[in-house]
Amino acid sequence: MKNEMWSGRFSGASDELLKEFNASLNVDKTLFNEDIQGSIAHATMLESCGILKKEELDAIIKGLEQVRSEIEQGKFIFDIKDEDIHMAVEKRLSEIIGSEIGGRLHTARSRNDQVATDFKLFVKKSHIELIKLLKELIQTMLEHAKVHKKTIMPSFTHLQHAQPVSFSFYILAYAFMLMRDIKRLQNSLELADFSPLGSCACAGTSYAINRELSAKILGFKDIMPNAMDGVSDRDFALDLLYDIAVIFTHTSRLCEEMILFSSSEFSFITISDSFSTGSSIMPQKKNPDVCELIRGKTGRVYGNLISLLTIMKALPLAYNKDMQEDKEGIFDSVKTAKDSLIILNAMLKEIQINKENMLNACKKGHLLATDLADYLVREKNIPFRKAHFIVGNVVAQAEAQGIDISEIKDLSKIDPVFDEKAMELLNFEFSLNSKQSEGSSSIASVEKQIQILEGFIQNL
């Protein structure tokens, strides 16, 4: 028996294997809200153009709202034979209001532009949700930054001790990464803000429809100006997947450092018991599973980006069934990102900063060496390369004595070029605040950075 809505030109029914293989309902039913939203906008536009009667529009809207309610309440029966969410909703609508009216909804519309519209609406909504979560995470980082302007810790290059900075300066580096993530999402959202609805299969329609009206109802800035591009475009999905991948690049770096900094070897931070797990055999263990999972999920969202890039590679215009595979990766990446940002924010709110351990760590690795070299250049007019060599010798002498250069009692005994004033440099807080360049680690600079971020999130 032929019962597919598109089966008129076929002489026989589809094989059951094809029905199961071809169906996407188990995945795209996530889009039920967007599908109903798009159909209401389309029907409203058709009525305004005289293609639907007012009573037909009223019946369609009432029926679609009933379908929405049934799905939300778990009463809707999803049948794989319906193939996808679009057909499932339309079939149920026709059952409720009759096929004579229900069958008119798809006038001047193809599933090609319908699915592109639904998908874009979901992607737009996801951008806004992710921006909100990133904003909240930045706010948590700012709270730490305000408290820890004088909490001194070592910075690292090559995971070796580099220079003294404040925890405030450190966490602000991540806050600025997240600020760029928000800007990236905003840019992608702007590029996605064009409606494909009304593009139909690929060439538009002979009906005199008003695409601008349906776009306005759905909250789009404008319409896709080329119908073939309208149904073929998945840049908006790729942009979101890329944006999420970069977010995870940043959060995975933070999580890696939280794992390191919470270890016994560092003990810079303590992760709350509420966000730690134990071992099935080792009673003493306290594992940073939240950070490890976010770090692990990074590979997952990278994979979703590569998957869609590969799906879209070399596809001829316009729509191809390959593009049915575009949604699962998006749904997974969006959920993964939202879940990860929520729990990362909650964990960061409760971390304990171990100030004494951070300060003690500064007494290893000769963090003040660069300050000494800069002093020789600035105060003694010594070329930097020569100053670098002189201070390198100071480091070697300190290591021979088994001490850090911050513990040297008299620099002039190592090299007479150093005077009493140079001894003032062997102080971590002095080093921190001696920086004068924009964006540096000094308290004054950190306060400016906090103001920049606060101004940014206030304007979101």
Curated annotation (Swiss-Prot):
It is found in: Cytoplasm. Keywords: Amino-acid biosynthesis, Arginine biosynthesis, Cytoplasm, Lyase. Belongs to the lyase 1 family. Argininosuccinate lyase subfamily. HAMAP family: Arg_succ_lyase (MF_00006). GO terms for biological process: arginine biosynthetic process via ornithine; L-arginine biosynthetic process. The gene is argH. This is Argininosuccinate lyase. One of its GO terms (molecular function) is argininosuccinate lyase activity. GO terms for cellular component: cytosol. Signal peptide: none annotated. It comes from Campylobacter jejuni subsp. jejuni serotype O:2 (strain ATCC 700819 / NCTC 11168). It catalyses: 2-(N(omega)-L-arginino)succinate = fumarate + L-arginine. Its EC number is 4.3.2.1. Gene3D superfamilies: Fumarase/aspartase (C-terminal domain) (1.10.40.30), Fumarase/aspartase (Central domain) (1.20.200.10), Fumarase/aspartase (N-terminal domain) (1.10.275.10). Pathway: Amino-acid biosynthesis; L-arginine biosynthesis; L-arginine from L-ornithine and carbamoyl phosphate: step 3/3.
